């Protein structure tokens, strides 16, 4: 496996890699959720690239940019074990110079939920991803459903800009107790981890209500909020797969999302129904 630190090194690798390139963009601190993306990428492409870059432009002032988990040595070992062809591990100076953002997330997506709570976040995500997509020339890009709003926004960008790649959505990976895997779980104390399970339990309860015939979104959200007590809830939302608010669950076309603070850590989770 090659370790690439500069844009030039990546460009030289890509130039000789052929057309069957798969790409997994990450911010490092890789866990089993990332591994599921990486393994799928490796199995479906002749050449696989994983980036680990903590992108500063998607963090708001006061967020956890400086303390975001960094585990480069562990990340490299994981990628080697998965059979990755090359890792791209740039620093911020390599990715950004005096350029201004030229890609802006549509207000339809960026003004609600995560976008409302973290204004400018999705602009920063698209800013780095369009660079990485162009650099890797990937045919397929693998992204997790856990960041559902991000996934839909990226799919929209790919469609709008006529980018010649396929965004491959990958299922959420959970601990045995139901907690969705996240690099930010490293911030949680044992007590926090117990409280964090309220997110997945709220989603499971919502799923059970739907299976029982309840399709009214206000009733489902009321039940979820009770399960989430006493957490500080940012939002509970039920939308269609283009992130339009809906009053009735549309089976096969609905995402149920939750964001809440657990201790000092903000967590998100969702299910697709």
UniProtKB/Swiss-Prot annotation:
A cellular component annotation (GO) from this entry: cytosol
Keyword Cytoplasm: yes
Pfam families assigned: Pantoate_ligase (PF02569)
Binding site for beta-alanine: 58
Protein task: Catalyzes the condensation of pantoate with beta-alanine in an ATP-dependent reaction via a pantoyl-adenylate intermediate.
Homology family: Belongs to the pantothenate synthetase family.
Name of the featured protein: Pantothenate synthetase
Keywords associated with the record: ATP-binding, Cytoplasm, Ligase, Nucleotide-binding, Pantothenate biosynthesis
UniProt subunit comment: Homodimer.
EC annotation from Swiss-Prot or TrEMBL: 6.3.2.1
Top EC class for this record: ligase
Pathway named in the protein's UniProt entry: Cofactor biosynthesis; (R)-pantothenate biosynthesis; (R)-pantothenate from (R)-pantoate and beta-alanine: step 1/1
A GO biological process held by the record: pantothenate biosynthetic process
Compartment annotation: Cytoplasm
Keyword tRNA processing tagged: no
């Amino acid at each position: 496996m090659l370790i690439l630190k500069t844009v030039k090194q990546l460009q030289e690798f890509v130039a000789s890699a052929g057309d069957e390139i798969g790409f997994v963009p990450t911010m490092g601190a890789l866990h089993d959720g990332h591994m599921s993306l990486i393994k799928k990428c490796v199995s479906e492409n002749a050449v696989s690239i994983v980036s680990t870059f903590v992108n500063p432009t998607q963090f708001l002032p006061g967020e956890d940019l400086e303390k975001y988990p960094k585990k480069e040595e562990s990340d490299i070992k994981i990628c080697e074990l998965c059979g990755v062809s090359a890792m791209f591990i740039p620093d911020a100076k390599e990715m950004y110079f005096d350029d201004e953002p030229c890609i802006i997330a549509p207000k339809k997506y960026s003004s609600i939920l995560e976008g409302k709570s973290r204004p400018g976040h999705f602009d920063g995500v698209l800013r780095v991803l369009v660079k990485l997509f162009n650099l890797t020339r990937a045919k397929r890009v693998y992204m997790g459903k856990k960041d559902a709003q991000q996934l839909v926004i990226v799919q929209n960008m790919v469609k709008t800009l006529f980018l010649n790649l396929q965004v491959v959505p990958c299922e959420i990976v959970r601990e045995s107790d139901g907690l969705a895997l996240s690099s930010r779980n490293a911030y949680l104390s044992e007590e926090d981890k117990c409280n964090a399970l309220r997110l997945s339990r709220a989603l499971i309860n919502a799923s059970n209500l739907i299976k029982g015939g309840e399709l009214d979104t206000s009733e489902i959200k009321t039940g979820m909020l009770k399960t989430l007590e006493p957490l500080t809830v940012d939002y509970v939302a039920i939308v269609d797969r283009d992130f339009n608010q809906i009053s009735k669950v549309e089976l096969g076309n609905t995402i149920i999302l939750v964001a809440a603070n657990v201790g000092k850590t903000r967590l998100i989770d969702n299910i697709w129904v």
